[in-house]
Amino acid sequence: MEYIKLGKSDLKVSKICLGCMSFGEKSKSLPWTLDQEQTDIIIKKALDLGINFFDTANCYGANGSSEKFIGNSFKKFVKDRKDIVIATKVRWNEGKTSKEAIMREIDGSLKRLQTDYVDLYIIHRWDYDHPIEETMESLNELVKSKKVRYLGCSSIFPYQLLKANMIARQHGWAEFISIQNHYNLIYREEEREMIQLLEEEKMVMTPYSAMGAGRLCRLYTDEPTERFKDDPNAIFKYAQAKDLDIPVIKRVKEVADKMKISMALVALAWIYSKPYVAAPVL
């Protein structure tokens, strides 16, 4: 396993971040999640392979149970908390990043994860109903209290990222060091403005959906996976762009066949060729 420093932080992370959205108790919107036994198997295998970077959220699995499940797994398989880097997120449970919500949600996450701190605390989306000054000040309080080591953001626009970091800079607060946005061979919107901003801010990306929800791993088929039968987010992201995606997917297949490797490796090689990408969430 190769490791990389996460942006301007001192976090040394594996170049693969294990996404933990698939772990947790099933719910109406997440009927495909894996139980504790299956979670243990995957977490143990990841650790054995040298993966030390894990990404979850307070809303993954019913009642935030992804955090609970991986917390249980870490208790079983991790001897020293410093050996792993845990990222979790805040917003969806309460739909906001007000001070009250942030303070409640971090305590809930820490309890479920069975840890005293998280290494990277990410705002899951922008909160249009509360001032970003309130959000950044509250997040800074978490850093000062040592409940959180570093801050990140997810799925926000470049102007929002710059605004948040400039406000933090003006007040001497902790800034966002990384962003987790949607980015892969068939979705490259971030190349319009976000990438240039990341380079100027000396930030890094930990992109999600590096495989395009599996679309970059095989030739296109109209037969849906279990997740695509039930997950409105996955359907929304890719179903409408099928005709645009298929030529790219076919080209990935051609390259994979020529190199005698899997399509997934081609998609990953493309992601890893980008200097602003630290570790894709897989």
Q: How would you label these PLM feature ranges?
A:
Residues M1-I84, K144:
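N-terminal binding-site loop/beta-alpha segment at the start of enzyme catalytic domains
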Residues L6, L18, T39, F54, ...:
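Conserved, mostly hydrophobic/aromatic
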Residues L11-I16, G50-N52, K79-I84, T115-D119, ...:
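Short, well-ordered coil/turn segments that N-cap beta-strands
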Residues C20, T56-N58, T88-V90, I122-R125, ...:
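A cross-domain feature marking catalytic cores of carbohydrate-active enzymes
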Residues K26, N93-E189, E193:
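Glycine/proline-rich, positively charged
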Residues V143, D230, Y238-L282:
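Conserved short secondary-structure transition element at the edge of the structured enzyme core
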Residues E189-E226, S262:
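Aromatic-lined glycan-binding groove of carbohydrate-active enzymes
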